[in-house]
């Protein structure tokens, strides 16, 4: 018996030694050689070089002198003729939302939704987004699902958002449900009679709400200034005192303050409140303070008072997310060829795409076109109205070298026009058409985002010590926008992933 035990021990030890030897033979470093390195903090020095990765981080970069010779036992990847850039950051996503569906449409479609959520993180990676930020967490369960997926971008979040009681976006829910859906709301004493008695004012101050975000692990806080939509512009909005308290609490907790605001009035309010990021472009030009109603909306060029506000936003280096695809995401229902794009099949499962094409799947288009206008007329209203205005405001900020931070608001609502990953590529096209240079877009999606999010110690550039999240492309993003669709390999924490393996068509 002792002899048998001894033999088993010897065999076990030998197996362990063999296993350790095999493990030790695995490459501990990856060398990417002869690749053109483009890093946003060093655009004056773009050159071919070698980058060494170890333990998921960039160990060193050699750009000058004779190329170093990789030692034996390391993994070597040739980057000859290709470009290496930081992984992209989308700082405005909503991971729990399913494009094209509200809660009613989701009923009875669990398998379809499960297939979508399996593909969701892969679709962001497919278009190079190695980091995303969820600005308003509706479901920690979905975020955990994404974080536990085999391949997924790094996920940060703002915790639960801070809507004003009964304001946007609480207003979309029935009165008896909205406080359960948005438990981190800001108490409004002026509406005390409309707030259930179980919610105590002292537990829903901006300070208390920000503390809950901090305790949940959030890196940012999201508030809203939205008077409404269409013919209903009577939603309650936060006061200067509320935003001032939120600003103080966010600063004390070292959290980034985002504010939803897509109007002239709201962006003046954001400027006065010293927010860190304005989450949306300016597609409404009304000035409620002066009672101008739709007069400014109809101005063919940027009015002087709007230019003045945009000048101050640019000078203050407030982060700015135009999110033009929010509007294009609605317009997509009136573009007959939109769902025929081969790009869409790469980011959503076939069963969901088939549903988008069904009469039921077009429900949202019918809802936003209440007057049943012809598609051409609907597109014209958008093109000559809010899309024109947001492009003009964005172009002006681009001329002023404003601090653009890239965010897409994916999906902005129950629309199939904002699909994960692809929506980022389409937003880049919108920004370029609006007047941003290729360099401005590149910086917005990398270093500007990293700095504003206080993640620049880890992300945003190609430098030693940074997380090895980066992309290999066949084209330079400083020369052509379609470089962002020329990705060959996505590196996630130092591990290479062939892009095509991330496509929805690759797993069906």
Language-model regions, residue ranges each:
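Metal-associated gating/positioning segment near the N- to mid-region
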Residues: 82-147, 168-175, 266-273
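Alpha-helix-loop-beta-strand connector modules within alpha/beta enzyme cores
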Residues: 149-161, 236-255, 313
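C-terminal cap of metal-dependent C-N hydrolases
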Residues: 426, 431, 467-507
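Acidic, glycine-enriched loop/beta-strand segments at the rims
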Residues: 37-50, 63-67, 388, 419, ...
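Divalent metal-dependent hydrolysis catalytic cores, especially in the metallo-beta-lactamase
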Residues: 117-142, 152-161, 217-228, 255-256, ...
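Active-site neighborhoods of metal-dependent hydrolases
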Residues: 196-232, 271, 275, 284-434, ...
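Histidine-rich, glycine-flanked metal-binding segment
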Residues: 43-85
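Active-site mouth loops of central-metabolism enzymes
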Residues: 102-115, 173-174, 179-207, 258
């Amino acid at each position: 018996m002792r002899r048998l035990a001894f033999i088993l021990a010897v065999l076990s030890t030998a197996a362990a030694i063999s296993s350790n030897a095999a493990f030790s033979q695995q490459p501990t470093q990856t060398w990417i050689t002869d690749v053109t390195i483009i890093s946003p903090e060093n655009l004056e020095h773009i050159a071919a070089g070698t980058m060494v990765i170890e333990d998921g981080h960039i160990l060193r970069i050699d750009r000058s002198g004779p190329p170093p010779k990789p030692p034996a036992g390391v993994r070597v990847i040739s980057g000859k003729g290709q470009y290496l850039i930081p992984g992209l950051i989308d700082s405005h996503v909503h991971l729990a939302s399913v494009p094209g569906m509200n809660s009613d449409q989701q009923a009875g479609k669990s398998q379809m939704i499960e297939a979508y959520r399996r593909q969701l993180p892969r679709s962001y990676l497919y278009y190079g987004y190695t980091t995303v930020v969820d600005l308003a967490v509706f479901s920690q369960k979905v975020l955990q699902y994404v974080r536990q997926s085999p391949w997924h971008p790094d996920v940060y979040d703002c915790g639960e958002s801070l809507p004003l009681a009964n304001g946007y976006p609480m207003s979309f829910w029935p009165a008896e449900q909205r406080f359960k859906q948005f438990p981190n709301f800001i108490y409004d004493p002026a509406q005390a009679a409309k707030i259930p008695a179980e919610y105590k004012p002292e537990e829903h101050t901006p300070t208390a709400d920000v503390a809950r975000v901090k305790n949940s692990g959030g890196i940012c806080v999201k508030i809203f200034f939205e008077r409404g939509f269409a013919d209903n512009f009577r939603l309650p909005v936060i006061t200067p005192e509320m935003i001032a308290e939120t600003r103080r609490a966010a600063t004390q907790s070292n959290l980034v303050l985002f504010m939803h605001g897509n109007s002239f009035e709201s962006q003046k309010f954001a400027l006065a409140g010293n927010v860190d990021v304005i989450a949306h472009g300016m597609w409404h030009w009304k000035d409620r303070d002066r009672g101008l109603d739709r007069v400014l909306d109809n101005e063919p060029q940027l009015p002087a008072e709007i230019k003045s506000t945009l000048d101050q936003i640019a000078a203050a280096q407030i982060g700015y997310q135009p999110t033009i695809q929010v509007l294009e995401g609605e317009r997509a229902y009136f573009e007959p060829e939109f769902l025929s794009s081969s790009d869409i099949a790469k980011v959503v499962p076939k069963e969901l795409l088939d549903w988008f094409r069904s009469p039921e799947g077009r429900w949202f288009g019918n809802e936003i076109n209440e007057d049943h206008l012809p598609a051409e007329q609907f597109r014209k209203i958008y093109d000559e109205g809010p899309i024109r205005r947001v492009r003009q405001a964005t172009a002006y900020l681009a001329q002023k070298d404003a601090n653009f931070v890239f965010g897409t608001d994916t999906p902005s609502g129950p629309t199939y026009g904002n699909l994960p990953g692809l929506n980022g590529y389409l937003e880049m096209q919108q920004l370029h058409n609006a007047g941003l240079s290729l360099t401005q877009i590149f910086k917005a999606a990398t270093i500007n985002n990293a700095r504003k999010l206080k993640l620049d110690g880890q992300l945003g550039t190609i430098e030693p010590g940074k997380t090895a999240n980066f992309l290999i492309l066949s084209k330079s993003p400083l020369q052509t926008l379609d470089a962002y669709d020329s990705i060959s390999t996505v590196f996630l924490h130092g591990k290479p992933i062939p892009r095509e393996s991330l496509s929805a068509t690759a797993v069906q």
